[in-house]
């Protein structure tokens, strides 16, 4: 009869045991929230440009000729701070989003690791999928809906939202809570696939780098490079879902019956290239985003391990 499987503790194994250190979900929530807040302050301008290009539909005709033109027009009309319009709505969402993502990932992965505390790539993908779905439902969908509506409103000739909280009140007053959950299906698909790809790549690269020693220290530079690779993979893997999600959450979402109809209309009216509109600015943002988040997350966890002992 096989011996019972050794229990998995949430503390570091004794030196020389070869068992991987596990991260307490509470630490993951704190570290993830901090990493998410810092990252969004650095990368928001590229997110703003990406959203503008995706909302700049061909049928209008287009307002911008490209990334550079979008930046020039924004700075000319609103100054450099114009590239940060809508930051508050994304910042309020980014902190809890990263907290939920990493907290859920560590919670799931701590129950899916082998007796040595290692997480293989396949299980890393599943844990990433679970983390992505959790952040989509709890945080991303309502916050992204408000963000897209706010940015879209500010570019109209008669903006009606005076700020983030005023925008939220108006959206809820006019459309109810349902108004903050537009594009939920697309968001769940997008975030789920996003984090599944990122954590799959990150887990694979970590396992390759650490080899037979799961506790081999990760240099922040190496973590950043791995994070950038994971981010790039997620961009090429799910940009079409990101485009559909943005359309479903914009002020003209009423044009589409559902997520599938949105995709069909984009393909029919604008062609397949429309699904990759905004890819270049998104690629730059996401690679930097994921690299920053993983580096800060890992470093904060290391610090927390010194001051917060978990059993």
From Swiss-Prot:
* Proregion positions: 1-13
| Entry keyword Mitochondrion | yes
**GO molecular function terms noted in the UniProt entry:** antiporter activity; citrate secondary active transmembrane transporter activity; citrate transmembrane transporter activity; tricarboxylic acid transmembrane transporter activity
The family database entries (Pfam families) matched by this protein are listed as: Mito_carr
Main location per UniProt? mitochondrion
What's this protein's function? Mitochondrial electroneutral antiporter that exports citrate from the mitochondria into the cytosol in exchange for malate. Also able to mediate the exchange of citrate for isocitrate, phosphoenolpyruvate, cis-aconitate and to a lesser extent trans-aconitate, maleate and succinate. In the cytoplasm, citrate plays important roles in fatty acid and sterol synthesis, regulation of glycolysis, protein acetylation, and other physiopathological processes.
Q: Which PANTHER family match?
A: SUCCINATE/FUMARATE MITOCHONDRIAL TRANSPORTER-RELATED, TRICARBOXYLATE TRANSPORT PROTEIN, MITOCHONDRIAL
Which protein are we looking at? Tricarboxylate transport protein, mitochondrial
Source species, please? Rattus norvegicus (Rat)
Q: Which gene encodes it?
A: Slc25a1
């Amino acid at each position: 009869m096989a011996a019972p499987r050794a229990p998995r503790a949430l503390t570091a194994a004794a030196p020389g045991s070869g068992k991987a250190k596990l991260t307490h979900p509470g630490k993951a929530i704190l570290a993830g929230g901090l990493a998410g807040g810092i990252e969004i302050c650095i990368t928001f301008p590229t997110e703003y440009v990406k959203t503008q290009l995706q909302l700049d539909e061909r049928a209008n005709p287009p307002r911008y000729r490209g990334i550079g033109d979008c930046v020039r027009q924004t700075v000319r009309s609103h100054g450099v701070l114009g590239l940060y319009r809508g930051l508050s709505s994304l910042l309020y969402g980014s902190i809890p989003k990263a907290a939920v993502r990493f907290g859920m990932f560590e919670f799931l992965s701590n129950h899916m690791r082998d007796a040595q505390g290692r997480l293989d790539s396949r299980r890393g993908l599943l844990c990433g999928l679970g983390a992505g779905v959790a952040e989509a439902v709890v945080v991303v969908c309502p916050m992204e809906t408000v963000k897209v509506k706010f940015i879209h409103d500010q570019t109209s000739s008669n903006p009606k939202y005076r700020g983030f909280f005023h925008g939220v009140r108006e959206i809820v007053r006019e459309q109810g809570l349902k108004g903050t959950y537009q594009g939920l299906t697309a968001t769940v698909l997008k975030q789920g696939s996003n984090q599944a790809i990122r954590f799959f790549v990150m887990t694979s690269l970590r396992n390759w780098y650490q080899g037979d020693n799961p506790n081999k220290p990760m240099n922040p530079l190496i973590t950043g490079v791995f994070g950038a690779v994971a981010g790039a993979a997620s961009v090429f893997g799910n940009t079409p879902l990101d485009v559909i999600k943005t359309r479903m959450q914009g002020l003209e979402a009423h044009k589409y019956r559902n997520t599938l109809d949105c995709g069909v209309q984009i393909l029919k009216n604008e062609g397949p290239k429309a699904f990759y509109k905004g890819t270049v600015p998104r690629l730059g943002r996401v690679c930097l985003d994921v690299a920053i988040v993983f580096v800060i997350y890992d470093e904060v966890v290391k610090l927390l391990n010194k001051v917060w002992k978990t059993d």
